[in-house]
A protein has these predicted regions:
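Beta-strand-enriched accessory nucleic-acid recognition/scaffold domains that flank the catalytic cores
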Residues: 2-310, 317-330, 342-735
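A short beta-strand element within the Helicase C-terminal
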Residues: 336-340
Length: 735
């Protein structure tokens, strides 16, 4: 433990642990050499330095982009070419969007904000009002490390803890920056894949199944039974989850990228330096409506504007035109991301289906069609709910985006699988575009529901009668039903593993009286897929659903196999003599475990503090939306963890300590605790037998399947943890 103390403190005093506490509200960027406050209330920019580029002047082509004068100290993006930022203006307003450098700003202007609003909107009304929350004035989390920065300023009120120079807080507050978006995606959501060709669906679901089978075979080969049981339990849980979420294997080089506008590109091009110049790629945005929202673009990495704005090697961004963004269900340039998939090139084995844009979506703008007459609410009720006016009609601002988006996404999926016409799909997609923007842009989504005839579409594509003759509407295909909520009797305790590997729960029938005086039976939430033994019971019978049902059932079967294997796996007998022989290793593991376990009460304390903070904020604002509560919870938990010093300490197991474990010097209970606090992948490598150079049949099948899907030799080798030469041998039939 490193103890900070004032000059003159005697050495013995640092062992007075009752008076040693975690550093509160401060964070270190250099391993404890110096500390800064974890969050400073943002500095504010004078609005005289800000100009607005309105719709009429081309702002609509870059809506959401913040252009910053290069070389201005208090507006530096650091090492990043682009970042999603918040900048406070005049102490009461703020702008948010994607910030990039610009070299052609007017004299006296350091920031230009691009908007789709017309010139009739006053400058300050284009900006957003800050929240009445000193911990979160933007209503959005700032990056914990690197979100705020300082610059040298002789008149500054802060002091650099290393150099002693006076500093000021930068105006830029980063929510995310270059490098934060580009994680490789390991899955393909059913929302996209279920609307593609049946051959692609089967291929990617088959790959996902092969991946899981190979993982199961590897776990079964592990030599340490306690490690084996730990991994089997985790594997079974993962398979159960996979059956519900229906995620297929990713396509080669599939990657998420943030989008930025480039006005000099053609509408058939994309600036994407992470991909090969000249190849074609598909862009998919979520939530995904259908193949009519997928642009297939040619990579043009020679574009001069792209090089100037994004650089030659952007970590995770692509440049597109506004027309392409509009096709992506009206994507904005304020931090929206797309999934990029190389495909449809001459030599590509990946073929993505893309169809022409729906005529009913042409020139449709959600804000023009359903936006309020004024950005100011006409009233705010006692619970803080905002009401707006449109064409003389007053409506409440949406506060349940996720729920409404789930409903319309399920409807679009069901309509697609059941063969809806293009005009019908256009109605549903228009409404989905309104729903996704409704909360952010204060749109009248209920009027959109009426105008687009959503009720009649639900009746036609989701209406059904049960065995008792009762009419129901809701998710109507396996794809939409899998994650649909269902209520089950309240369950108590841990589930029991049945002889076939399935789980059974102890159900408790509890009755209670609701606020209306009615007697109810207490239930808990589950999903329809989790509660059925056969996924086909959720299918309406389409070929796409059959492919997904086969996959889901294979995941359920693997989960059951894993649990049967777990029950039949023994344990290493505890050996007192081994404990004596490896005495120092046992002591070392005990010390490491004790250190790791010390975090548990701190984490509980952090959770308690965070819950109290969020409860207080909810009391001040009873009508907080789910999204606002989630943001507040994340921020409160981060601050509470810093406050109490809660941080997970991973146990690093040495070679000698592993020998002690294998010899039985550690009891099974203690080893289980150690495994719960270490890097399980490293342990898996230690426990995997090295006696054979042959790879399993399931891995051989994966090599063939990945090759058929277009993965390169090196990509297959990385995915399977083997050498490229081994991959080549098996592909050439030499093994």
């Amino acid at each position: 433990i490193k103890v900070l103390c004032p000059p003159g403190t005697e050495h013995k005093e640092i062992y007075d642990y009752e008076n040693v506490h975690s550093v509160k509200d401060y964070i270190s960027y250099d391993g404890g050499e110096s500390f800064r406050k974890s969050f400073e209330y943002p500095s504010s920019m004078d609005s005289k330095r800000l100009d607005i580029r309105y719709k009429e002047d081309g702002g609509i082509d870059k809506d959401g982009v913040i252009e910053i004068r290069r070389g201005v100290k208090d507006l530096s993006l650091g090492d990043a070419h682009y970042a999603q930022v918040r900048i406070m203006v005049d102490g009461k307003k703020y702008i948010k969007g994607m910030a990039v450098y610009s070299d052609d700003l007017p004299d006296g202007v350091d920031v230009i904000f691009n908007t789709n609003k017309s010139k009739s909107t006053p400058k300050m009304e284009v900006l957003k009002d800050i929240k009445n929350d000193p911990d979160n004035p933007f209503g959005s989390l700032i990056k914990e490390r690197g979100g705020q920065s300082y610059y040298d300023d002789p008149k500054g009120k802060y002091t650099d803890p290393i150099t002693g120079k006076k500093q000021s807080l930068s105006l830029v507050n980063k929510r995310a920056e270059e490098g934060d978006w580009g994680e490789w995606s390991k899955t393909l959501p059913s929302q996209f894949l279920s609307k593609q060709s049946l051959s692609l669906i089967k291929k990617q679901l088959g790959l996902a199944t092969a991946d899981k089978q190979a993982e199961f075979d590897e776990i079964k080969s592990l030599t340490n039974p306690t490690v084996k049981k730990t991994l089997l339990k985790s594997f079974a849980d993962d398979c159960d989850s996979a059956a519900v979420h229906l995620q297929a294997a990713a396509l080669p080089r599939q990657k998420y990228q943030v989008i930025l506008p480039l006005t000099s590109l053609k509408d058939t091009e994309v600036y994407a330096p992470n991909y090969k110049d000249g190849e074609t790629v598909a862009l998919i945005r979520y939530p995904h409506g259908g193949t009519f929202e997928i642009p297939i673009l040619k990579v043009n990495n020679k574009n001069a504007e792209g090089k100037r704005v994004l650089g030659n090697t952007p970590a995770d961004a692509v440049g597109i035109t506004k027309k392409v963004a509009d096709r992506l269900s009206g994507a904005d340039f304020d931090g929206d991301t797309v999934m990029v998939i190389p495909c449809n090139s001459t030599n590509s084995k990946v073929k993505i289906t893309s169809t022409h844009s729906l005529k009913g979506l042409a020139d449709f703008d959600t804000k023009d069609a359903y936006g309020p007459d004024s950005s100011k609410p006409v009233k705010v009720d006692a619970k803080g709910r905002e009401y707006y006016s449109r064409n003389g009609k007053t409506y409440q601002r949406m506060n349940n985006t996720q729920t409404e988006m789930g409903k319309i996404s399920n409807l679009i999926t069901d309509m697609t699988l059941k063969g809806a016409t293009e005009p019908e799909l256009a109605r549903a997609v228009r409404h989905s575009m309104v729903v996704i923007d409704a909360e952010k842009h204060k749109l009248d989504y209920k009027q959109s529901e009426i105008d687009n005839g959503i009720k009649s579409l639900k009746t036609k594509y989701q209406g059904s009668y049960d065995s008792n003759g009762h009419y129901h509407e809701g998710a109507a295909t396996l794809i939409s039903r899998a994650k649909s909520e269902t209520q089950v009797l309240k369950r108590k305790g841990s589930p029991k593993i049945n002889p076939d590997g399935s789980l059974s729960y102890k159900e408790v029938r509890e009755e209670y009286t609701d606020k209306d005086g009615k007697v109810r039976v207490r239930t808990q939430k589950s999903t329809k897929m989790a509660e059925t033994r056969d996924a086909r019971t959720l299918s309406s019978g389409t070929p796409q659903e059959e492919a997904y049902a086969k996959y889901a059932n294979s995941m359920k079967s693997l989960a059951n196999q894993a649990r049967r294997e777990m029950v039949s796996t023994g344990k290493i007998a505890y050996s007192a003599s081994a404990k004596t022989a490896y005495q120092s290793e046992v002591k070392s593991l005990d010390a490491k475990l004790n250190l790791a376990l010390r975090n548990a009460p701190r984490e509980r304390q952090a959770q308690t503090l965070a819950n109290a903070t969020v409860a207080a904020k909810k009391k001040e604002n009873p009508d907080m939306t789910k999204a606002e509560v989630k943001k507040a919870s994340q921020q409160a938990l981060t601050q509470a963890r810093n406050q109490v010093g809660a941080s997970r300490t991973s146990i690093d197991i040495t070679d000698r300590e592993w020998e002690a474990i294998q010899a039985g010097a550690i009891s099974e209970n203690k080893l289980t605790q150690i495994l719960n606090n270490t890097n399980i992948d490293t342990v898996r490598q230690r426990a995997t037998p090295r006696a054979t150079t042959q790879i399993s049949k399931s891995k051989q099948n994966r090599i063939a399947a990945l090759n058929a899907s277009g993965y390169s030799t090196s990509e297959i080798a990385d995915a399977l943890g083997i050498s490229s030469s081994t991959v080549v041998k098996y592909l050439n039939g030499k093994e």
